[in-house]
């Protein structure tokens, strides 16, 4: 009597179906985890800058002149922008720090003559706003199911999934929540 060793086609099909079911559950869960991690990192960086802004104001009595390049080498003081994550990997969010009243960078900008520029001199630095918006590839959001964030010195902390809805003062009127 000879014994045949191996698996039948039915047994192999069952294994393939089980693996497909596990993958169908695991992959979306992993993607959601990655988006939550990226959002937590964006919130952490926004709160870190907010803390540094308050320290700066305690010493200087104004937010004007704040420059985050001592914290982040990728911070652009002329525009007040920072790519998140800051380690230089694929950008998920763009953080923008501006004066609340003028919507211009808080950093002091100097012209070629060494004097402060007109745009920079219009900044009083009494309040600030931090917008954290999802990065885009062309016109497509990299993480369409994630949030855009808003944080201000006046205590506004909101987030929204609606793209391009975050302004200087609000996260829009629909589909937003506090964080």
Regions found by a protein language model. Give the residues of each.
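N-terminal single-pass transmembrane signal-anchor helix
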Residues: 1-34
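Residues at secondary-structure transition points
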Residues: 4, 36-40, 44, 119, ...
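Alpha-helix exit/C-cap motif
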Residues: 36-40, 47, 51-72
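Short, charge- and proline-biased low-complexity linear segments
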Residues: 45-51, 77-82
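Periplasmic/extracellular, small/polar-rich flexible segments of pilin-like filament-forming proteins
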Residues: 59-179
């Amino acid at each position: 009597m000879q014994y045949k060793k191996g698996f039948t086609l039915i047994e192999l099909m069952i294994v393939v179906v089980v693996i497909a079911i596990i993958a169908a559950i695991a992959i979306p869960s992993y993607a959601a985890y990655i988006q939550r991690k990226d959002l937590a990192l964006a919130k952490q960086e926004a709160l870190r800058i907010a803390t540094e802004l308050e320290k700066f104001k305690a010493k200087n009595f104004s937010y004007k002149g704040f420059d985050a390049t001592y914290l982040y080498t990728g911070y652009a003081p002329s525009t007040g922008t920072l790519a998140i994550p800051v380690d230089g990997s694929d950008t998920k969010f763009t953080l923008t720090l501006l004066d609340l009243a003028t919507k211009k960078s808080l950093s002091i900008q100097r012209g070629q003559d060494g004097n402060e520029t007109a745009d920079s001199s219009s900044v009083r630095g009494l309040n600030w706003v931090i917008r954290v918006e999802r990065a885009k590839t062309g016109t497509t959001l990299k993480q369409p199911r994630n949030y855009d964030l808003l944080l201000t010195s006046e205590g506004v902390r909101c987030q929204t999934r609606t793209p391009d809805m975050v302004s200087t003062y609000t996260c829009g009127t629909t589909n937003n929540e506090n964080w």
